[in-house]
Amino acid sequence: MALWILLPLLALLILWGPDPAQAFVNQHLCGSHLVEALYILVCGERGFFYTPMSRREVEDPQVGQVELGAGPGAGSEQTLALEVARQARIVQQCTSGICSLYQENYCN
C-alpha cells in the first residue's frame, strides 16, 4: 500500500487526538511522584511545604493535633495548623482527585 494513501488518516488522528500538553498537566500524583512533580515542574528552587507523616501519625490521627486557642505561643501553633491543612489539600487534590501542575499555590 502506498504511503501517501495513509497520510489523510494520519492527519485525522493528529487533529482529533488529545493535546499532549493538556494530558500531561492534569494527573493523579501520589507519594514520591507528587513530591518530584512539585519540586521539578512547579516550585523549583522556591520549594514547597511537605512533611511526610510517620506510620504512627497515619494510624493515630490524634498525634500531632494542634489546638487553635489563644494563649502563649498560639501564633506558632496556628501557623503549624495552617501548614498541616495546606499539606492535606495538596494530598487531597493530587492523590484523590486530579491536580494541575500549573497551580503554584503549593509553593513556599
Swiss-Prot record:
Q: Which keywords does this Swiss-Prot/TrEMBL entry list?
A: Carbohydrate metabolism, Cleavage on pair of basic residues, Disulfide bond, Glucose metabolism, Hormone, Secreted, Signal
Q: What Pfam family is a match for this entry?
A: Insulin
Q: Which residues form the signal peptide?
A: 1-23
Q: What subcellular compartments does it reside in?
A: Secreted
Q: List the disulfide bonds.
A: C30-C94, C43-C107
Any Gene Ontology CC annotation: extracellular space
- Segments traversing the membrane: none
Question: What does the protein in this record do?
Answer: Insulin decreases blood glucose concentration. It increases cell permeability to monosaccharides, amino acids and fatty acids. It accelerates glycolysis, the pentose phosphate cycle, and glycogen synthesis in liver.
**Similarity section:** Belongs to the insulin family.
Name of protein = Insulin
> Which organism is the protein's source?
Rodentia sp
